[in-house]
UniProtKB/Swiss-Prot annotation:
<dbReference type="GO" id="GO:0005739">
    <property type="term" value="C:mitochondrion"/>
</dbReference>
<dbReference type="InterPro" id="IPR014039">
    <property type="entry name" value="Transl_elong_EFTs/EF1B_dimer"/>
</dbReference>
<keyword id="KW-0496">Mitochondrion</keyword>
<protein>
    <recommendedName>
        <fullName>Elongation factor Ts, mitochondrial</fullName>
    </recommendedName>
</protein>
<dbReference type="GO" id="GO:0003746">
    <property type="term" value="F:translation elongation factor activity"/>
</dbReference>
<dbReference type="InterPro" id="IPR001816">
    <property type="entry name" value="Transl_elong_EFTs/EF1B"/>
</dbReference>
<comment type="function">
    <text>Associates with the EF-Tu.GDP complex and induces the exchange of GDP to GTP. It remains bound to the aminoacyl-tRNA.EF-Tu.GTP complex up to the GTP hydrolysis stage on the ribosome.</text>
</comment>
<dbReference type="InterPro" id="IPR018101">
    <property type="entry name" value="Transl_elong_Ts_CS"/>
</dbReference>
<comment type="similarity">
    <text>Belongs to the EF-Ts family.</text>
</comment>
<dbReference type="Pfam" id="PF00889">
    <property type="entry name" value="EF_TS"/>
</dbReference>
<keyword id="KW-0648">Protein biosynthesis</keyword>
<feature type="region of interest" description="Disordered">
    <location>
        <begin position="387"/>
        <end position="406"/>
    </location>
</feature>
<dbReference type="GO" id="GO:0070125">
    <property type="term" value="P:mitochondrial translational elongation"/>
</dbReference>
<keyword id="KW-0251">Elongation factor</keyword>
<dbReference type="InterPro" id="IPR036402">
    <property type="entry name" value="EF-Ts_dimer_sf"/>
</dbReference>
Length: 406
């Protein structure tokens, strides 16, 4: 009788082991699920595949059902987590810039800038957080209609509450993210569930392609981001849009008037026949110079504490010129960020203000004194609008204090 016990024990172990092997999700299904939802852990992928199996096929993996289960679980967990961390301060994060068209390569400038906040710099450097900022900025660039429609402003601040309900448009469209469309709010909630910190969309600005142009003029945008903590994952499929992020960023609209806009902003500027190669090459060179000028202006706005395009009055302009090192008006600042590719003499950035340099560039390349002007700009820094109670420390401060770094 005692001799039979080891045999029975082995039989039970064999049956249990066989049962576990039959119900364990396959490596292929786990890999497919993690590819569809980057950042999903092995344990969470296995749990999702097991929990989403059909009663009629308890041993069959269903990746689509697992994706739906994960999204539903994250939405529920994220909502609970959001309620728990709602009172926390989000003074860290990143500012994302997405440009669909700069108005030079193709007519109609279209771009957006967003500030996505979190509690700690650690999360701000996370790839999942960076990818979310990229997708939200891309969505904002596609949705200028949510900006205030009763204004003729070239660059508009978007109502964040309305924007959160928009369907998110992934920066990289692929087969892996073809599952159910979700809103910007839901995408943020999902990331809260995955990262465990409060994540909030601070502000959104969008450049509408039809708002700045008028007869005989064209709109060009320039952008620049500085102090990038971590770049989001590179897209696996080619995309026409560009993205940049950083702790300080600027987005501005440049309006081009006169012969220059008619020559190089038309749809036919780059589609001339071979007998016009000389003119086409000249137009291409002018485009490169204009793009470099717009880039220089964006660098200038980001590099200085810029708050406006120009001083509000002539008296203020004189005062700003007298102390241009701290001037908040872009046009009164010394143009120290001017790139050589813009086509002006390098000494210009040491001798002239931005206003003088633009006038010189207009006379040289645009064919008229007022051929180019800065129509609007935004310059943001991470956390500058964060409200913190005077008697409360942030989660980031608590972490630093616990680590002895405060």
């Amino acid at each position: 009788m005692r001799a039979m016990r080891p045999v029975a024990h082995l039989a039970r172990c064999f049956c249990a082991s066989s049962s576990v092997k039959e119900t364990r999700p396959s490596i292929q299904a786990i890999a497919e699920l993690r590819k569809a939802l980057p950042g999903t852990s092995m344990l969470k992928a296995r749990e999702a595949l097991t929990a989403s199996r059909s009663p009629d096929a308890p041993d069959t993996d269903n990746v689509e059902a697992a994706i739906a289960w994960l999204e539903q679980t994250r939405a529920s967990d994220g909502a609970k987590r959001e309620a728990k961390v709602a009172s926390r301060v989000t003074a860290e994060g990143t500012i994302g810039l997405c440009t669909l068209s700069d108005g030079i390569s193709s007519p109609g400038a279209r771009a957006a800038m967003v500030e996505l906040n979190c509690e700690t710099d650690f999360v701000a450097r996370n790839d999942i957080f960076g990818a979310l900022a990229r997708d939200i900025a891309h969505t904002a660039a596609w949705f200028p209609i949510v900006a205030a429609s009763e204004t003729s402003a070239v660059l508009s601040d978007v109502d964040v509450a309305a924007f959160l309900e928009c369907p998110i448009i992934p920066f990289e469209a692929s087969e892996e993210n073809k599952h159910d469309v979700i809103s910007v709010r839901a995408a943020i909630t999902s990331v809260v569930a995955r990262l465990g910190e409060k994540v909030a969309l601070g502000r959104v600005a969008s450049l509408a392609p039809t708002s700045g142009g008028s007869h005989g003029s064209a709109l060009v945008c320039g952008s620049f981001a500085h102090g990038t903590a971590s770049a989001p994952p590179a897209p696996q499929t080619p995309v026409a849009a560009t993205f940049a992020s950083g702790r300080v960023a600027s987005l501005l609209a440049v309006q081009v008037h006169g012969p220059l806009s008619q020559r190089i902003m038309s749809r036919t500027a780059t589609t001339q026949h071979n007998d016009h190669d000389h003119d086409r090459n000249g137009d291409d060179e002018r485009k490169r110079q204009l793009r470099a000028l717009a880039r220089s202006l964006a660098r200038q706005a980001a590099g200085f504490p810029t708050t406006s395009v120009d001083a509000p009055s002539a008296t203020a302009a004189v005062a700003s010129d007298a102390s241009s090192e701290t001037s908040g008006a872009l046009l009164t600042q010394p143009f120290v960020m001017l790139l050589p590719a813009a086509g002006l003499d390098p000494s210009v950035n040491e001798q002239k203000s931005v206003r003088d340099a633009l006038e010189l560039w207009s006379n040289t390349y645009a064919g008229q004194a007022d051929g180019i002007r800065v129509a609007a700009l935004r310059r943001w820094e991470v956390g500058e609008t964060a409200a913190r109670p005077s008697d409360e420390t942030s989660f980031a401060d608590q972490v630093k204090e616990a680590a002895g770094l405060a």
